[in-house]
């Protein structure tokens, strides 16, 4: 991805990995999920790769495959809005990674310690619940 190329070219990849390993809270949405995944199905690893997940890029198709749904997420009361745009999904979790949300049998949110990832874009909705969840992760270290 362009983001991974920039991280490498600017010499930031290893410092970011080190900061996450040292406990820096990080939240990756959509492409951020791809950057944090240790495995991407069918692709070599040139990413941050700090989270015990396997992701599938553009799993929901291209722009026309984008959609909105409300669904539950572990640790948040009620359903939350989820907007998917050319979104990946998590095919597999292992180690310390924990599934937080699924939509139609596909994993769309996960957590591993100080790392949170979602396949959807919470910034495109008015709900702040996922942001509050991330802040609670930081405050409850």
Where do the language-model regions lie?
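A secondary-structure boundary/capping signal
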Residues: 29-31, 51, 86, 120
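Short glycine-/acidic-enriched loop or helix-start segments at secondary-structure transitions
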Residues: 3-6, 36-39, 45, 94-95, ...
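A residue-level structural signature of the nucleotidyltransferase/glycosyltransferase Rossmann-like core
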Residues: 4, 25-26, 48, 82, ...
């Amino acid at each position: 991805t362009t983001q991974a190329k920039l991280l490498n070219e600017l010499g930031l990849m290893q410092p970011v990995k080190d900061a996450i390993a040292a406990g820096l809270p990080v939240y990756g949405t959509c492409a951020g999920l791809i950057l944090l995944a240790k495995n991407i199905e069918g692709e070599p690893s040139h990413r941050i790769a700090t989270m015990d997940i396997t992701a599938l890029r553009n799993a929901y198709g291209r722009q026309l495959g984008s959609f909105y749904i409300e669904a539950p997420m572990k640790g948040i009361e009620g359903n939350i809005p989820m907007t998917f745009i050319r979104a990946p999904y998590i095919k597999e979790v292992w180690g310390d990674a924990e599934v937080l949300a699924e939509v139609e049998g596909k994993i769309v949110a996960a957590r591993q310690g100080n790392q949170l990832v979602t396949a959807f874009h919470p910034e495109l909705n008015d709900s702040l619940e996922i942001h509050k969840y991330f802040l609670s992760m930081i405050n409850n270290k």
